[in-house]
Amino acid sequence: MSWIQKILPRTQTSHKGNVPEGIWTKCGSCQAVLYKSELEKLQEVCPKCDHHMRITARRRIDAFLDDGDRVELGAEHEPQDVLKFKDSKRYKDRIVAAQKSTNEKDALVVMQGKLKGMPVVVACFEFAFMGGSMASVVGARFVAAVNACLENDMPLICFSASGGARMQEALMSLMQMAKTSAALAKMSKKGLPYISVLTDPTMGGVSASLAMLGDINVAEPKALIGFAGPRVIEQTVREKLPEGFQRSEFLVEKGAIDMIVDRRDMRDRLHSLLVKLHYKN
């Protein structure tokens, strides 16, 4: 202890209590600091600027469907490394890592349940699983969703969030574009409604197939939607793209999608759309 510390009076310092981790989060758009618990109640939509943050597939389904009996479809389908693919890492290892981090077997979750009492099937992409990439299991589960609708005369709603086809499955991944499109043609032939909801981001092979084949194509605000990304396009055409290019507001203005719906209003709006499509069950 120094001589100055001996002669100066001691002051009582209050110790701040430890703040538990995971209570706060920051909006990626307006940088507002938000309570995580409040944000969860708002379905991950910022109360300050209405920025739609990414949400897990199961949380989206839980918020969208009625409480009560639900049946998961296609869960028996699990990914296989048929090609023994390896880039900087083995595909098999990437699958295991993605399964551990998301607690999902693959990038699509399909659930049969009810929307305001109306029987429906909901397919929802899990973007955290390898960028929501479409591979064999995603195609198989989507077809399982369509088959359930065909067998029970139910509408299908799909929430897309994907970077496109999964590179590690090569042509088998690309084949899912044709497979899912052919399945949806059967729904159209039978007159069953299919509503596609495009969320941030919906790109590549998913946007070029099942995501744009809805009887009504809906998007969340400011969602990035397209085939190639804006940077790739700019480098290819060597021109500056218009502001907001490939965002949902730009696309609805140009007629590429039908409407933009806030996530918090999605249940009401989609139920209303199904009623207007004269769907009855």
UniProtKB/Swiss-Prot annotation:
Cofactor note: Binds 1 zinc ion per subunit.
Reaction catalysed by this enzyme: N(6)-carboxybiotinyl-L-lysyl-[protein] + acetyl-CoA = N(6)-biotinyl-L-lysyl-[protein] + malonyl-CoA
Homology family: Belongs to the AccD/PCCB family.
EC nos: 2.1.3.15
Oligomeric form and interacting partners: Acetyl-CoA carboxylase is a heterohexamer composed of biotin carboxyl carrier protein (AccB), biotin carboxylase (AccC) and two subunits each of ACCase subunit alpha (AccA) and ACCase subunit beta (AccD).
Name assigned to this protein: Acetyl-coenzyme A carboxylase carboxyl transferase subunit beta
Superkingdom of this protein's organism: Bacteria
Main location: cytoplasm
NCBIfam families, A to Z: accD
Any one GO CC term of the record: acetate CoA-transferase complex
Keywords associated with the record: ATP-binding, Cytoplasm, Fatty acid biosynthesis, Fatty acid metabolism, Lipid biosynthesis, Lipid metabolism, Metal-binding, Nucleotide-binding, Transferase, Zinc, Zinc-finger
Gene from which the chain derives: accD
Lineage: Bacteria, Pseudomonadati, Pseudomonadota, Gammaproteobacteria, Alteromonadales
Cofactor: Zn(2+)
Organism: Alteromonas mediterranea (strain DSM 17117 / CIP 110805 / LMG 28347 / Deep ecotype)
Physiological role: Component of the acetyl coenzyme A carboxylase (ACC) complex. Biotin carboxylase (BC) catalyzes the carboxylation of biotin on its carrier protein (BCCP) and then the CO(2) group is transferred by the transcarboxylase to acetyl-CoA to form malonyl-CoA.
